[in-house]
Regions:
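C-terminal structural segment of proteins
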Residues: 1-302
Length: 302
Protein backbone atom coordinates (compact mmCIF):
# COMPACT_ATOMS: atom_id res chain seq x y z
CA UNK A 1 0.00 0.00 0.00
CA UNK A 2 1.30 3.43 -0.92
CA UNK A 3 -0.98 6.40 -0.14
CA UNK A 4 1.32 9.28 0.69
CA UNK A 5 -1.31 11.97 0.07
CA UNK A 6 -4.00 10.64 2.46
CA UNK A 7 -4.22 12.96 5.47
CA UNK A 8 -7.37 11.75 7.22
CA UNK A 9 -9.67 8.75 7.66
CA UNK A 10 -13.25 9.59 8.62
CA UNK A 11 -15.90 7.13 9.77
CA UNK A 12 -19.05 8.17 7.95
CA UNK A 13 -21.72 6.89 5.59
CA UNK A 14 -23.10 10.35 4.83
CA UNK A 15 -22.51 11.32 1.18
CA UNK A 16 -22.97 14.98 2.12
CA UNK A 17 -19.58 14.82 3.87
CA UNK A 18 -17.86 13.84 0.62
CA UNK A 19 -15.61 16.34 -1.13
CA UNK A 20 -13.25 16.10 -4.12
CA UNK A 21 -10.22 14.00 -3.25
CA UNK A 22 -12.21 11.61 -1.05
CA UNK A 23 -12.74 7.89 -1.59
CA UNK A 24 -15.33 5.64 0.01
CA UNK A 25 -13.78 2.68 1.80
CA UNK A 26 -15.33 -0.56 3.06
CA UNK A 27 -12.99 -3.56 3.29
CA UNK A 28 -10.31 -1.68 1.37
CA UNK A 29 -8.76 -4.82 -0.12
CA UNK A 30 -8.55 -3.34 -3.62
CA UNK A 31 -8.01 0.26 -2.53
CA UNK A 32 -5.03 -0.68 -0.38
CA UNK A 33 -3.55 -3.12 -2.88
CA UNK A 34 -3.62 -0.56 -5.72
CA UNK A 35 -2.54 2.44 -3.66
CA UNK A 36 -3.03 6.08 -4.70
CA UNK A 37 -1.04 9.28 -4.96
CA UNK A 38 -4.05 11.58 -5.37
CA UNK A 39 -6.51 10.80 -2.55
CA UNK A 40 -6.77 13.22 0.38
CA UNK A 41 -9.24 11.45 2.66
CA UNK A 42 -10.75 7.98 3.10
CA UNK A 43 -14.41 7.80 4.15
CA UNK A 44 -14.79 4.56 6.10
CA UNK A 45 -18.33 3.14 5.95
CA UNK A 46 -17.64 -0.04 7.96
CA UNK A 47 -19.14 1.47 11.12
CA UNK A 48 -22.39 2.46 9.41
CA UNK A 49 -24.26 -0.27 11.26
CA UNK A 50 -26.10 -1.56 8.20
CA UNK A 51 -27.63 -5.02 8.53
CA UNK A 52 -25.52 -7.23 6.25
CA UNK A 53 -28.39 -9.37 4.93
CA UNK A 54 -32.10 -8.64 5.20
CA UNK A 55 -34.78 -11.12 4.13
CA UNK A 56 -38.24 -9.86 3.21
CA UNK A 57 -41.16 -10.83 1.00
CA UNK A 58 -39.57 -8.72 -1.73
CA UNK A 59 -36.29 -10.63 -1.69
CA UNK A 60 -32.82 -10.36 -0.18
CA UNK A 61 -31.16 -7.02 0.51
CA UNK A 62 -27.36 -7.22 0.68
CA UNK A 63 -25.64 -4.26 2.32
CA UNK A 64 -22.63 -2.83 0.55
CA UNK A 65 -20.66 -3.57 3.73
CA UNK A 66 -21.63 -7.26 3.79
CA UNK A 67 -18.42 -9.30 3.69
CA UNK A 68 -17.87 -12.20 1.35
CA UNK A 69 -17.63 -14.51 4.37
CA UNK A 70 -21.04 -13.38 5.63
CA UNK A 71 -22.64 -13.83 2.23
CA UNK A 72 -21.06 -17.27 1.73
CA UNK A 73 -22.52 -18.47 5.05
CA UNK A 74 -26.01 -17.15 4.33
CA UNK A 75 -27.55 -20.08 2.35
CA UNK A 76 -27.02 -22.41 5.31
CA UNK A 77 -28.03 -19.82 7.91
CA UNK A 78 -31.05 -18.40 6.06
CA UNK A 79 -34.57 -18.85 7.43
CA UNK A 80 -36.08 -22.21 6.51
CA UNK A 81 -38.67 -20.61 4.25
CA UNK A 82 -35.97 -18.83 2.25
CA UNK A 83 -33.94 -22.04 1.85
CA UNK A 84 -37.02 -23.88 0.60
CA UNK A 85 -38.43 -21.18 -1.68
CA UNK A 86 -35.23 -19.66 -3.09
CA UNK A 87 -33.25 -22.33 -4.94
CA UNK A 88 -31.12 -19.65 -6.59
CA UNK A 89 -29.34 -19.19 -3.25
CA UNK A 90 -27.18 -22.02 -4.57
CA UNK A 91 -25.42 -19.44 -6.75
CA UNK A 92 -24.01 -17.65 -3.72
CA UNK A 93 -21.28 -20.15 -2.73
CA UNK A 94 -20.36 -20.70 -6.38
CA UNK A 95 -19.82 -16.99 -6.95
CA UNK A 96 -18.03 -16.51 -3.62
CA UNK A 97 -15.73 -19.40 -4.49
CA UNK A 98 -14.84 -17.57 -7.69
CA UNK A 99 -12.62 -15.33 -5.55
CA UNK A 100 -10.44 -18.31 -4.57
CA UNK A 101 -9.04 -15.98 -1.92
CA UNK A 102 -7.87 -16.68 1.62
CA UNK A 103 -10.24 -16.52 4.58
CA UNK A 104 -8.48 -13.29 5.58
CA UNK A 105 -9.65 -11.62 2.39
CA UNK A 106 -13.15 -13.13 2.66
CA UNK A 107 -13.51 -11.70 6.17
CA UNK A 108 -12.68 -8.17 5.00
CA UNK A 109 -13.64 -7.83 1.32
CA UNK A 110 -17.20 -6.60 0.79
CA UNK A 111 -19.93 -7.19 -1.75
CA UNK A 112 -20.27 -3.48 -2.47
CA UNK A 113 -16.55 -2.97 -2.86
CA UNK A 114 -16.27 -5.79 -5.38
CA UNK A 115 -19.11 -4.34 -7.46
CA UNK A 116 -17.83 -0.76 -7.31
CA UNK A 117 -14.37 -1.79 -8.45
CA UNK A 118 -16.03 -2.59 -11.78
CA UNK A 119 -13.70 -5.43 -12.72
CA UNK A 120 -15.07 -7.66 -15.51
CA UNK A 121 -14.29 -10.74 -13.38
CA UNK A 122 -15.91 -9.38 -10.21
CA UNK A 123 -17.92 -12.36 -8.90
CA UNK A 124 -20.32 -10.18 -6.91
CA UNK A 125 -21.14 -8.40 -10.14
CA UNK A 126 -21.76 -11.82 -11.69
CA UNK A 127 -24.06 -12.88 -8.85
CA UNK A 128 -26.09 -9.70 -8.58
CA UNK A 129 -26.55 -9.14 -12.31
CA UNK A 130 -27.59 -12.76 -12.89
CA UNK A 131 -30.31 -12.39 -10.23
CA UNK A 132 -31.57 -8.99 -11.46
CA UNK A 133 -30.03 -7.14 -8.52
CA UNK A 134 -31.10 -3.52 -8.03
CA UNK A 135 -28.62 -1.11 -6.45
CA UNK A 136 -29.60 1.61 -3.99
CA UNK A 137 -27.28 4.60 -4.38
CA UNK A 138 -27.07 7.65 -2.09
CA UNK A 139 -25.91 10.98 -3.55
CA UNK A 140 -24.12 13.98 -1.97
CA UNK A 141 -27.16 16.19 -2.66
CA UNK A 142 -29.24 14.09 -0.25
CA UNK A 143 -31.19 12.19 -2.90
CA UNK A 144 -31.16 8.47 -3.62
CA UNK A 145 -31.68 6.47 -6.77
CA UNK A 146 -32.07 2.85 -7.78
CA UNK A 147 -30.65 1.20 -10.86
CA UNK A 148 -30.01 -2.38 -12.02
CA UNK A 149 -26.49 -3.63 -11.36
CA UNK A 150 -26.35 -4.37 -15.10
CA UNK A 151 -26.44 -0.58 -15.58
CA UNK A 152 -24.14 0.20 -12.65
CA UNK A 153 -21.05 -1.60 -13.98
CA UNK A 154 -20.48 -0.08 -17.42
CA UNK A 155 -16.94 -1.06 -18.39
CA UNK A 156 -13.56 -2.36 -17.28
CA UNK A 157 -13.03 -0.54 -13.98
CA UNK A 158 -15.90 1.83 -14.76
CA UNK A 159 -19.25 2.35 -13.03
CA UNK A 160 -22.19 4.70 -13.44
CA UNK A 161 -21.58 6.21 -9.98
CA UNK A 162 -21.21 9.98 -10.06
CA UNK A 163 -18.52 11.65 -7.91
CA UNK A 164 -19.39 11.21 -4.24
CA UNK A 165 -22.19 8.71 -4.77
CA UNK A 166 -22.28 5.79 -2.35
CA UNK A 167 -23.60 2.29 -2.99
CA UNK A 168 -25.83 1.47 -0.01
CA UNK A 169 -27.12 -1.99 -0.93
CA UNK A 170 -28.22 -4.39 -3.64
CA UNK A 171 -31.60 -6.13 -3.51
CA UNK A 172 -32.12 -9.48 -5.21
CA UNK A 173 -35.84 -9.85 -6.04
CA UNK A 174 -37.69 -12.88 -4.74
CA UNK A 175 -38.88 -13.72 -8.26
CA UNK A 176 -35.28 -14.26 -9.39
CA UNK A 177 -34.36 -16.15 -6.22
CA UNK A 178 -37.19 -18.62 -6.90
CA UNK A 179 -35.76 -19.42 -10.31
CA UNK A 180 -33.89 -22.51 -11.41
CA UNK A 181 -30.28 -21.67 -12.25
CA UNK A 182 -27.18 -23.05 -13.97
CA UNK A 183 -23.57 -21.91 -13.54
CA UNK A 184 -20.45 -22.25 -15.69
CA UNK A 185 -17.03 -20.73 -15.16
CA UNK A 186 -13.61 -20.95 -16.80
CA UNK A 187 -10.09 -19.85 -16.00
CA UNK A 188 -6.88 -20.45 -17.92
CA UNK A 189 -5.12 -21.56 -14.72
CA UNK A 190 -6.04 -23.69 -11.74
CA UNK A 191 -6.27 -20.74 -9.37
CA UNK A 192 -6.62 -17.94 -11.87
CA UNK A 193 -9.04 -15.08 -12.34
CA UNK A 194 -12.28 -15.91 -14.13
CA UNK A 195 -11.92 -15.68 -17.90
CA UNK A 196 -15.55 -16.60 -18.62
CA UNK A 197 -18.47 -16.74 -16.20
CA UNK A 198 -21.96 -17.50 -17.51
CA UNK A 199 -25.11 -17.91 -15.42
CA UNK A 200 -28.49 -19.05 -16.71
CA UNK A 201 -31.85 -18.60 -15.04
CA UNK A 202 -35.25 -20.13 -15.76
CA UNK A 203 -37.99 -18.16 -14.04
CA UNK A 204 -41.29 -19.56 -12.84
CA UNK A 205 -43.10 -17.96 -15.79
CA UNK A 206 -40.76 -19.69 -18.26
CA UNK A 207 -38.56 -16.65 -18.96
CA UNK A 208 -34.98 -17.63 -19.78
CA UNK A 209 -32.22 -15.22 -18.72
CA UNK A 210 -28.54 -15.60 -19.58
CA UNK A 211 -25.90 -13.35 -18.02
CA UNK A 212 -22.32 -13.15 -19.28
CA UNK A 213 -19.56 -11.67 -17.12
CA UNK A 214 -15.74 -11.89 -16.96
CA UNK A 215 -15.57 -12.58 -20.72
CA UNK A 216 -16.93 -9.10 -21.47
CA UNK A 217 -15.91 -5.64 -20.30
CA UNK A 218 -19.31 -5.16 -18.70
CA UNK A 219 -22.16 -7.53 -17.82
CA UNK A 220 -24.29 -8.64 -20.76
CA UNK A 221 -27.77 -10.02 -20.13
CA UNK A 222 -30.04 -11.77 -22.63
CA UNK A 223 -33.76 -12.44 -22.07
CA UNK A 224 -36.11 -14.77 -23.87
CA UNK A 225 -39.81 -15.43 -23.26
CA UNK A 226 -38.98 -19.15 -23.19
CA UNK A 227 -35.90 -21.33 -23.46
CA UNK A 228 -34.47 -20.47 -26.90
CA UNK A 229 -33.22 -22.88 -29.50
CA UNK A 230 -29.48 -23.25 -29.92
CA UNK A 231 -29.57 -21.11 -33.05
CA UNK A 232 -31.65 -18.39 -31.38
CA UNK A 233 -29.27 -18.20 -28.44
CA UNK A 234 -26.19 -18.05 -30.64
CA UNK A 235 -27.71 -15.32 -32.81
CA UNK A 236 -28.64 -13.21 -29.79
CA UNK A 237 -25.15 -13.59 -28.30
CA UNK A 238 -23.63 -12.41 -31.58
CA UNK A 239 -26.04 -9.49 -31.74
CA UNK A 240 -25.52 -8.42 -28.12
CA UNK A 241 -21.73 -8.73 -27.89
CA UNK A 242 -19.71 -7.02 -30.59
CA UNK A 243 -15.98 -7.53 -31.07
CA UNK A 244 -15.02 -4.49 -29.00
CA UNK A 245 -16.92 -5.73 -25.96
CA UNK A 246 -14.91 -8.94 -25.44
CA UNK A 247 -12.37 -8.43 -22.67
CA UNK A 248 -8.68 -8.76 -23.50
CA UNK A 249 -6.01 -9.28 -20.83
CA UNK A 250 -3.55 -11.90 -19.58
CA UNK A 251 -6.44 -14.02 -18.31
CA UNK A 252 -7.77 -14.77 -21.80
CA UNK A 253 -7.76 -13.59 -25.39
CA UNK A 254 -11.03 -12.22 -26.82
CA UNK A 255 -11.25 -15.10 -29.32
CA UNK A 256 -11.00 -17.68 -26.53
CA UNK A 257 -13.54 -15.86 -24.38
CA UNK A 258 -15.93 -15.63 -27.34
CA UNK A 259 -15.64 -19.32 -28.20
CA UNK A 260 -16.01 -20.49 -24.60
CA UNK A 261 -18.94 -18.16 -23.91
CA UNK A 262 -20.81 -19.71 -26.84
CA UNK A 263 -19.96 -23.19 -25.62
CA UNK A 264 -20.93 -22.62 -21.98
CA UNK A 265 -24.09 -20.74 -22.94
CA UNK A 266 -25.22 -23.75 -24.96
CA UNK A 267 -24.47 -26.07 -22.02
CA UNK A 268 -26.62 -23.89 -19.80
CA UNK A 269 -29.41 -23.67 -22.37
CA UNK A 270 -29.50 -27.46 -22.68
CA UNK A 271 -29.44 -27.93 -18.91
CA UNK A 272 -32.34 -25.59 -18.25
CA UNK A 273 -34.32 -26.92 -21.21
CA UNK A 274 -34.28 -30.38 -19.63
CA UNK A 275 -36.66 -31.31 -16.81
CA UNK A 276 -35.39 -30.27 -13.39
CA UNK A 277 -33.83 -33.14 -11.41
CA UNK A 278 -35.96 -34.18 -8.42
CA UNK A 279 -35.18 -32.10 -5.31
CA UNK A 280 -32.24 -30.41 -7.05
CA UNK A 281 -32.13 -26.74 -6.20
CA UNK A 282 -28.49 -25.70 -6.42
CA UNK A 283 -26.92 -24.94 -9.79
CA UNK A 284 -24.67 -27.59 -11.24
CA UNK A 285 -20.96 -26.94 -10.66
CA UNK A 286 -18.68 -26.61 -13.66
CA UNK A 287 -17.47 -29.78 -15.32
CA UNK A 288 -13.78 -30.84 -15.47
CA UNK A 289 -10.55 -29.25 -16.68
CA UNK A 290 -9.24 -26.53 -18.95
CA UNK A 291 -6.37 -25.31 -21.06
CA UNK A 292 -5.97 -22.53 -23.59
CA UNK A 293 -6.43 -24.90 -26.52
CA UNK A 294 -9.08 -27.28 -25.26
CA UNK A 295 -10.65 -25.38 -22.39
CA UNK A 296 -13.21 -26.76 -19.99
CA UNK A 297 -14.29 -25.30 -16.67
CA UNK A 298 -11.75 -24.88 -13.87
CA UNK A 299 -11.54 -22.93 -10.66
CA UNK A 300 -10.24 -19.38 -10.74
CA UNK A 301 -10.13 -16.24 -8.70
CA UNK A 302 -10.47 -12.52 -8.55
Amino acid sequence: MDMPTVSDVIRTADPQQWRPGDAWMAGGTVLFSYGSDTLARLLDITAAGWESLTVSEDGLEIAATCTIAELFAFPDAAPAAAREQWPALGLIPLCCDSFVASFKVWNVSTVGGNICTGLPAGPMTSLTTALDGVALVHSPDGTSRRLPVTELVIGDGRTALAPGELLRSVTLPASALRARTAFRRLSLTNLGRSGVLVIGRLDEDGTFVLTVTAATKRPVQLRFAAVPTRAELRAELDRSIDAALWHDDVHGLPEWRHYMTDRLAEEIRAELAAPAPPAASAPAPPAASASANTPAPKEGSL
